[in-house]
Amino acid sequence: MMSEHDLADVVQIAVEDLSPDHPVVLENHVVTDEDEPALKRQRLEINCQDPSIKTICLRLDSIEAKLQALEATCKSLEEKLDLVTNKQHSPIQVPMVAGSPLGATQTCNKVRCVVPQTTVILNNDRQNAIVAKMEDPLSNRAPDSLENVISNAVPGRRQNTIVVKVPGQEDSHHEDGESGSEASDSVSSCGQAGSQSIGSNVTLITLNSEEDYPNGTWLGDENNPEMRVRCAIIPSDMLHISTNCRTAEKMALTLLDYLFHREVQAVSNLSGQGKHGKKQLDPLTIYGIRCHLFYKFGITESDWYRIKQSIDSKCRTAWRRKQRGQSLAVKSFSRRTPNSSSYCPSEPMMSTPPPASELPQPQPQPQALHYALANAQQVQIHQIGEDGQVQVGHLHIAQVPQGEQVQITQDSEGNLQIHHVGQDGQLLEATRIPCLLAPSVFKASSGQVLQGAQLIAVASSDPAAAGVDGSPLQGSDIQVQYVQLAPVSDHTAGAQTAEALQPTLQPEMQLEHGAIQIQ
């Protein structure tokens, strides 16, 4: 038998024969000096790391893109912050609004300002004043300075006085070109004679008393003399407002219509600023609305800031409607009686109604005017009601010779009565026309509003101009003429009045866009 050593040699030889290129060395193989060195094998590189490197590169690219987007966002925020800090409003062009009389308009970017905080400081000196300081974060005015202003400016005042800090022109953020009251407080300056302006940003407002409007009501808490303003709204209307207005904003806009005529709203705003030269709504009345909302609904300063924006928006809407020749009337007021009107239409440019002692006394009734018809067999009467609609009434008078008189009277109920007066001064016939809407409001181009029976419109035709000769007038032949009523005591005085007014019976007005304007 073969020994163990011999068997190992045989196995080694057999393995070398099987793999001549890669000889396998067994563990028990002993290398001697005579043996040849083993062949070195070539090392193969493994490329399995390529997908991992590509994934890392893609992630790095994604991070870089996000960093670039973050940098762009930071730059945008820096630009906006600089824009707000430096108050640099970049104007933008907006397309023309349909029906706009001025064509394309220009506006500014809306910038919301910080809502000012209201601090009420009571002053127990003899003037019993209130210091209502509107603190702006950009202002460093101290409360003591405002109290000193009161002490130096209004010594010995009997009524309460409000001192208001008004944001200056540079502090206002204009919402658009029509209003400059985006950031200003509503009670910024006073339109009453008892108010005084101190500096550019402080105005004194003297609170009124019950004697100013004995038939009116209080805005605000009537038991708190520091948070109430007397207004001309009668108690029944105030009850109606309190019942129907469920939100603070609706009540504010409703009170605005009761306290300010739409004509006043169209030419005014809260700040009295803007490129259109608008006037300022009476700050005392606006302060009364503010007190009323705080008392009824417990609103906050933030709510009042939003309501002020709605008031300014309502004024801008009235201004646009006026520019387009549209009606400015309040539809809910169309059935109100003259006594329930809180404003005086005969004085539309006043922010608030005058006290009861200054109201004009009603003219005696009836009022009459003798008007000479020129071959007219039909009289057309135009009236504009409080809803702004032109109401037309027709009167047919048969066989009225040229040169004879027609007497127009108005009774205490507002009804018009047309009388045909013969040459002997006797009333031949009478026709009664119910008053279409009372009071009738006639608007002139100057902005003056005439109320009730102060002005009526009758229609006739000049035979030479219309080409008619005693035949019934056609609608196109009627020329609208306006004649002011004059009180007469008898028919003789009426005839003299007609002779005096005869040269003035020329067409002076025209009907345009549903409103009557003086040429």
Curated annotation (Swiss-Prot):
SMART domains per record: BEN (SM01025)
A molecular function (GO) term: DNA binding
One GO cellular component term noted in the UniProt record for this chain: nuclear body
Ranges of Pro residues composition bias in the record: 351-364
UniProt subcellular location: Nucleus; Nucleus speckle; Cytoplasm
Positions of region (Interaction with CUX1 and HDAC1): 152-342
Cross-link (Glycyl lysine isopeptide (Lys-Gly) (interchain with G-Cter in SUMO2)) at residue(s): 133
Positions of post-translational N6-acetyllysine modification: 275
InterPro entries listed in its UniProt record: BANP, BEN_domain
One GO BP annotation of this record: chromatin organization
Coiled coil: 53-90
In-chain residues carrying the UniProt-annotated modification Phosphothreonine: 337, 352
A Pfam family this chain is assigned to: BEN
Tissue specificity remark: Down-regulated in breast cancer cell lines.
Ranges annotated as biased composition (Polar residues): 335-344
Comp. bias (Low complexity): 180-189
Alphabetic keyword roster: Acetylation, Cell cycle, Chromatin regulator, Coiled coil, Cytoplasm, Developmental protein, DNA-binding, Isopeptide bond, Nucleus, Phosphoprotein, Repressor, RNA-binding, Transcription, Transcription regulation, Tumor suppressor, Ubl conjugation
Protein name, per record: Protein BANP
